[in-house]
Swiss-Prot record:
Family: Belongs to the bacterial solute-binding protein 1 family.
Keyword Protein transport: no
GO CC annotations on file: outer membrane-bounded periplasmic space
Example GO biological process: thiamine transport
Its job: Part of the ABC transporter complex ThiBPQ involved in thiamine import.
Residues where thiamine binds: 64-65, 166-167, 202, 220-223
Gene: thiB
Origin species: Brucella melitensis biotype 1 (strain ATCC 23456 / CCUG 17765 / NCTC 10094 / 16M)
Name the record gives this protein: Thiamine-binding periplasmic protein
Amino acid sequence: MRLLSLLTFSLFAVIGLAPAAQAKDKLTIYTYDSFVSEWGPGPKVKENFEKECDCEVNFVASADGVALLNRLKLEGSKTAADIVLGLDTNLTTEARASGFFAPSGIDQTNVKVPGNFKDDIFVPYDYGYFAVVYDSEKLPNPPKSLKELVEGDPAQKIVLQDPRTATPGLGMLLWMKSVYGDEAGAAWQKLQKRVLTVTPGWSEAYGLFTKGEAPMVLSYTTSPAYHMVVEKTNRYKALAYPEGNYLQIELAAQTTTGAKNPLAKKFLAFMTGPGFQDVIPETNWMFPAGKTSKPLPAAFDALPKPEKTLLIPPYEVAKNRRLWVNEWLAATSR
């Protein structure tokens, strides 16, 4: 029998009919580039979830959250995305109206974010506050308020992100609108004198900053924690402004395509627990939105705490985003 089995196997191998290993189920996640970088949360999240699901996770990266939504709109119902990870509350109304997202169907009891944001489609996975981050060795006297940033020395440059492609850029746009209202256009004209460049996403902007191209960058109050934990330096600092800092809550959702893949719902549930949440503080350098199994790194205790939280309702952002982007374009192109 052994000989017969061996001969049978050999025959199948020769004619290319040898039994193949069963292909694993796949989950495709669209996200932003820093999430999937070697130092981002992507690799560890992928490892943890694949152990749990015995599946294959494929990340597809775009520049940032706004670009993710733009891409999904272009692809429509033909998208390969099961999950889109990297939107934020500023995009939820527009994203819902697209019709490309499906209810999560998961228990969100473990999810806790400022303002108690809850949604049947969009699930929070982390949050943070936009802030000016500066190099204390190059800028010993940074702007102590948004007003000082807008009206300060044009020689002290800042790197910003494009609100048309990057959620931090959109966050800055809404921050300016929250503080300056109808005078935002005039404020942008003043601030433009300090802007070294505007990048498509966060990664490019922060890279220019750490390379010394500018002493300031738009980032998060939590960004200095990376330098404290990984580089063992307090050189880079964030600023909490008296006018308030704009809140960002990052979200993930399953697409209508993903709703047909059982792994999508399973991933969203996994995302609210320690297998995902424990990875966030020291890779995405944001506050976790779900259940963790350990406390935050001690460096987070040293971070500035915003005196006031700013957040424009999603429906108002959706109604006015194009108008406000055009206002920014008109002001900064003069």
